[in-house]
Design a protein with these regions (language model features):
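Functional-site microenvironments in short loops/helix caps that host divalent-cation chemistry
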Residues: 1-129, 136-138
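Short, structured beta-strand segments at or near domain termini in extracellular proteins/domains
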Residues: 136-148
Length: 148
């Protein structure tokens, strides 16, 4: 899906794309873990990584990959769109990265099926695949967030 399509789908469901900071918090919790499940490199049972082109896997193939908040499948297989524009860290919500106009390069998080195991971390950021929010890619997915 495109970033715009993902954003529109989430809105249709009464939700929104998470910000980059929200995505990272959901993936790593408060203990600063390297991967959603802890600090050990992933196994093939936990995530899809290091695979060839166009080799995503059904998400039900994986287990033991829950984040501290119980969120599943946040590392590997497909990058996730977030609402935030790609900007250098450190994160600052007031630096324009949360502007929702479609123009800027958007961030993706989590790593994809072809990412190496040591790059599907809770802090991994992408922008190469997401340069155009109007273009989709087979290696980008999304999840929706809601306000509580």
């Amino acid at each position: 899906p495109t970033w715009l399509g993902a954003r529109e789908y989430c809105a249709w469901r009464g939700r929104r794309l998470p910000s980059e900071a929200e995505w990272e918090k959901a993936a790593r919790g408060t203990d600063q873990r390297r991967y959603p499940w802890g600090n050990r490199l992933p196994t093939r049972a936990q995530a899809q990584f290091g695979a060839r082109f166009n080799d995503t896997a059904p998400i039900e193939n994986f287990s033991g990959n829950a984040s501290p908040y119980g969120v599943l499948n946040m590392a590997g297989n497909a990058w996730h769109w977030v609402s935030s524009a790609y900007r250098p860290y450190p994160y600052r919500a007031d630096d324009g990265r949360e502007d929702l106009t479609p123009g800027p390069v958007r961030s993706t998080r989590g790593g994809g099926h072809d990412s190496p195991a040591d790059e599907i971390t809770t802090t991994q950021r992408g922008r190469t695949l997401s340069r155009n929010p109007r273009a989709g890619h087979h290696n980008i997915s999304f999840r929706c967030a809601k306000n509580e």
